[in-house]
A protein has these predicted regions:
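A short hydrophobic/small-residue beta-strand
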Residues: 117-118
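Alpha4-beta5-alpha5 switch/output surface of CheY-like receiver
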Residues: 104-107
């Protein structure tokens, strides 16, 4: 079973990734989910996938999610710093970076620095910092079969 973190789980790519995981739950354990402000989707995802943690970049959104998921064994965090911490979690096999724009660059680098495989849907990580991003690939390559 592969442990996966999804940055941007409430966006279209994150939602589609969770749809795949839903079809093959024996293959993946969702460890971390992150979002910005979409509390409704995040609450539903938290209840269904029971990740170890959820991080909402927006502090007020995190408070809403925390209240809704009270009683479940899910750690709720807020802020970009926490998102960066979990991006580098060495206990995760795969990080799906579905963040929009340049905001996804730093988490990508953090994961690669720590030897975490990255599934990148965020082209800005390559456009803005392609040389830097590629320079870390020796820490995760050769590519491993995920499913």
């Amino acid at each position: 079973m592969k442990k996966i973190s999804i940055l941007g789980s409430t966006g279209s790519i994150g939602v589609n990734a969770l749809n795949v995981i839903r079809k093959i739950p024996e293959k993946f354990q969702v460890m971390h989910l992150t979002g910005n402000m979409n509390t409704e989707k995040m609450i539903a995802q938290g209840k269904e996938f029971l990740p170890a943690s959820i991080t909402m970049v927006d502090i007020q959104a995190a408070e809403i999610v925390e209240k809704a998921l009270k009683g479940l064994s899910i750690e709720i965090y807020s802020g970009r710093d926490k998102l960066l911490d979990l991006a580098g979690d060495k206990n995760v096999d795969l990080l799906l970076n579905a963040l929009v724009g340049a905001s996804g660059m730093e988490p990508t680098l953090k994961a690669l620095e720590n030897g975490v495989d990255v599934a990148l849907s965020n082209k800005e990580s390559l456009v803005v910092a392609g040389d830097i991003t590629v320079s870390y690939t020796h820490l995760t390559l050769p590519t491993k079969r995920i499913v």
